[in-house]
Amino acid sequence: MALLTLFSGLFSREAKAKSATMKQFDLKDGEIQHMVIFNLPYPGGSAEATKFLKDGTRILSGIPVVRDFQAFKQVSPKNDYQYGFSMVFSNQADYTTYNEHPDHVAFVQDRWMKEVSDFLEIDFKKPF
């Protein structure tokens, strides 16, 4: 019986961990998952690339309507983009607020347009 209780507890913790991991992609109605994948003109792992990613994370995640901000580095040879940013907005109004926010506008003008060589922007809502 004790062994059954132990396994039950392990499976329960595993299910909770899986649920927490999947929760970040479980959009609610009206929420928007905003992602951008991009290239920088710097060698991977360079001080310049690291600075861009850290600055982008600090600046963009500091905008009040941004939720669940994450920065990513590409690991697959199937994709030509090196990096990614991802975030969630509660609704279209928050997404618009983000796009018009002075910190976002400044980051795009001062850093993005000068340092990003290529990008693809993706915005998703739940399909059903």
Predicted regions and their residues:
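Short S/T/G/P-rich N-terminal loop/turn motif that feeds into the first structured element of a domain
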Residues: A2-Q82, S90-T97, D123-F128
